[in-house]
A protein has these predicted regions:
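Extreme N-terminal starter segment of soluble prokaryotic enzymes
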Residues: 1-3
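Acetyl-CoA-dependent GNAT
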Residues: 5-76, 87-93, 142
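Residue-level recognition of the GNAT/N-acetyltransferase active site
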Residues: 74, 78, 105-107
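Conserved acetyl-CoA-binding loop-helix of GNAT-fold acetyltransferases
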Residues: 79-92, 112-117
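Short glycine/proline-centered loop/turn elements that form peptide/ligand docking sites
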Residues: 83, 87, 108-111, 128-133
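Conserved GNAT acetyl-CoA-binding A-motif
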Residues: 93-105
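Conserved catalytic-core motifs of GNAT/GCN5-like acyltransferases
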Residues: 101-103, 116, 121-137
Length: 143
């Protein structure tokens, strides 16, 4: 598996994965396109397996912090360590003395476990954060 920076040509496959992983709250084509093309403070990493994009993570950078705004792995390839590889790559590339933040659905137990195992801590709850009304757990990891 190869982790690389995203390219404009990745948009269709990222959108396909996004819709399959988040059917009720998927980002739009325009939202994903912005993440891929607005490079001032954003970065998207993708992971390829057998020359096919199978997962991605989208980041936004601020002063002394990085926000993981979206991450997904093709549902047919989940639970085999791809998400962990992407997350570790993200964490390995955080600038020194920065913190990483993310929101995760309160009921997304596999993702919560992944983040806790990576060292993230719960710091807050955002009520009714997602379009379906589910709360988000805000998590932070200080480097």
């Amino acid at each position: 598996m190869i982790i690389r920076a995203s390219e404009k040509g990745d948009l269709a496959r990222i959108l396909q994965i996004e819709k399959s992983v988040f059917p009720n709250s998927a980002w739009t084509r325009a939202m994903i396109s912005d993440e891929l093309t607005l490079n001032v403070d954003r970065k998207t990493w993708v992971i390829d397996s057998n020359k096919e994009l199978v997962g991605y993570c989208m980041l936004r950078y601020g002063p002394n912090e990085v926000h993981l705004v979206n991450m997904a792995v093709d549902p047919s390839l989940q639970k085999i360590g791809i998400g962990k590889k992407l997350l570790n790559h993200f964490l390995d590339n955080i600038p020194k003395d920065s913190s990483a933040y993310l929101e995760v659905k309160r009921g997304n137990f596999p993702a919560i476990k992944l983040y806790l195992n990576a060292g993230f801590k719960d710091i807050a709850i955002r009520e009714d954060y997602y379009p379906d009304g589910e709360d988000a757990i805000v998590m932070c990891l200080k480097k």
